């Protein structure tokens, strides 16, 4: 099936090896291949796993854990292997390879990541178009001798000038004889000979295979260095087949030039090569190390710079254009296909600038020394395709790619396209791919952000009601969703004037307002290609601005509501405190008034107050003031409840009138008490005192003349008011006429009651005039009200005062009435 291997793809001995897997060893392809094969086999043959042939679950778990551990450590092992390989390659290259006394690997000046293309740099150095990696000196002196220069160049301690260490001793090079010179020329000609097309295909294939290794460099002891071609005895069947297939039509595609090792010669003009190179050392202005004077020169300002500093200079990372300019050095395909997109928000990669004069398109030139040592190419790569030209085969070793070193400094700058100029882009040819990857990544992030913001806005719009099925992103869609909310949903944010203002803001750049509904529904989802990115960016910016303003308005509204709520709570608290203070002040003022006027002002002839007792008072609070309802219930004497201060009769009256139960007293009190409004109770005016005086003395008269009428037929439930006498003036007039034995009986029921009434209404004659004046003040005309008010001030008691039952004793020694 899909996971099982077909018959053609299986190894020839798979069934036999699988059947004898328990007795034989592991597969030669490794544990991973064996585990994958067994897993796929067990997955495709469940019957074997049921029978126990396919393997156990413990082995599967162990294999899975081992595979997971390998996956986690694979990258670390790979990095470690690469690091060890780089160290070995560096040591080998510094020991066996050099170019004119310099090296092809860095010398550790910079410890960062080497992200330049090492193959390109190696080729440029072997071609003498870029300076090799010279060994830098921390210190240099013009007075150093040859062996001191040699020690400094080799990294050894600098000896004294007059002392030559044994490892630095050298002998003068022997003179080259004619025979040796001819053999050397023959070897050089063999290395520079171009293969002839008339030779066999296998010979050309062997020569190309042996002399053009892809990544490994030849050593001096290799057959390539000795000049002998590989023997046909060492040819394998694979090489023969490859030569037949690749060289069938007589064309050879050799991508890499052929490297050769020049004869080893440690002397230049009779001097050691180190002494020759470092006798005129120059300082690099960037790393401040001393190098041989054969350094790179900037193309613009002709400043020296070493190769290690040069390979560290690169383009900045891709970034948005700072001044709205598109990348002038963008790839041609990108510039032609996405010209409209590049001008909007495409990332750009500006070329590196010169560290000295800040000229863009930084590049260097190199003038090699006048001698050749170490590695070189067999022929010029530009002349290799021309096989008919005999010049390349006869070119001498010393004359190839040698440029004359002029002592005069270059006066003019070179162009970045000059063939001798090496720019930073040539050292890092993958900058275009990195730029394309960065642009693709930025486009994906922008699309994801746009989708997220759009989805969030649509979700908010759907939750608020309205036309939730129009998934348009344009300004008109925003306007439509903002204005299309349900007017009945008061909690919706789209109905607020703030969001309407935002919707108007988003529509500020629209051209027309009448658009077809279908076109409006589609929005700006599929506009032309040249404006799609700009529209998406504008919509995203406006939606983000709308959301920010909406959040700001919402927070401001919430803050305002919170402040209003706190203000209301504070006002309510202050009002409550004011009411409480007013109530306390009123109560304190009333009690102080009561304290000053607590003694009942009665005529002096009536006697003194012997005792007082508090009565039950019903208190009722009203919004305008505080009124009190008098409920005076005495179990011994049935006294009228309408009076605030009553004068009790002698003790003989208690024997005449039996005590009344509390229900009869309460009913009698409710039927007899006049109803007063709260407004009247809360006004502390002189009219209130007048009414209090009237009520006091009317109750006094009632207690003297008509208390016995309150109980009819023994039940005491009379619905008729007790104030049914003619008038206070008439009653007082009748009392004056009868003098001391006067009687005023209404609704007389029996003789004992009449006698009791007569006994209760007996007052001293000398006080009748005073009481008469008070009672006449209550019934006087309005013209004489002021005089009556002044005269009766001594007998007024405020209505809110607690009613008290007092005993009045006669000066003549009448028996006291107990309350």
UniProtKB/Swiss-Prot annotation:
Keywords: Cytoplasm
Keyword Heme: no
InterPro entries attached to this UniProt entry: Sip5/DA2
Domain of life: Eukaryota
Composition bias type Low complexity, residue spans: 198-211, 327-344, 691-720
Protein's UniProt keywords contain Cytoplasm: yes
Biased composition regions of type Polar residues, renumbered to the chain: 212-233, 487-497, 641-651, 662-679, 747-760, 808-819
Subcellular location: Cytoplasm
Composition bias, Basic and acidic residues: 29-39, 57-78, 168-185, 317-326, 556-585, 734-746
Disordered: annotated span: 1-78, 157-265, 317-345, 478-497, 513-534, 556-779, 792-819
An example Gene Ontology CC term for this record: cytoplasm
Function description: May negatively regulate the snf1 kinase.
Homology family: Belongs to the SIP5 family.
Protein name according to UniProt: Protein sip5
Gene name of the record: sip5
